Amino acid sequence: MFRTMMNGKIHRATVTEANLNYVGSITIDSAILEAVDMLPNEKVQIVNNNNGARIETYIIPGEPGSGVICLNGAAARHVQVGDVVIIMSYGMFTAEEAKTHEPKIVVLDEKNHIEMILPEEKAHTTL
């Protein structure tokens, strides 16, 4: 049996752009992607802390160090510039792999610079 587990998480990203007229996706600073082991075209779930929206799309890498978090296409309807979002990727693991899997988690500051890298997510973590 395979289990779907969180593989990477970008916590408290601030939306810098929303481009309704783009074909689709989310553009993410490629330095952030590298830190959480997310890849171009990988499926991600985005949770908007401001309005509760949850959407799925795929990643387009942005300029490294730019701090860009841009929702494109229809996804742009679910955010406003300045909204705080959580971006998560998932992977399929065997039951044995799932027991020891440790996702990569980064917490961003208000300018989308990596503030902290968490080795794991503890229950009742408050940031």
Curated annotation (Swiss-Prot):
Main location: cytoplasm
Co-factor note (free text): Binds 1 pyruvoyl group covalently per subunit.
Annotated gene: panD
Assembly mode: Heterooctamer of four alpha and four beta subunits.
GO biological process, alphabetically ordered: alanine biosynthetic process; pantothenate biosynthetic process
Native species: Listeria monocytogenes serotype 4a (strain HCC23)
EC number(s) recorded for this UniProt protein: 4.1.1.11
Protein name (Swiss-Prot/TrEMBL): Aspartate 1-decarboxylase
PTM text: Is synthesized initially as an inactive proenzyme, which is activated by self-cleavage at a specific serine bond to produce a beta-subunit with a hydroxyl group at its C-terminus and an alpha-subunit with a pyruvoyl group at its N-terminus.
Binding site for substrate: T57, G73, A74, A75
Listed pathway(s): Cofactor biosynthesis; (R)-pantothenate biosynthesis; beta-alanine from L-aspartate: step 1/1
Residues with the Pyruvic acid (Ser) modification: S25
Residues spanning the membrane: none
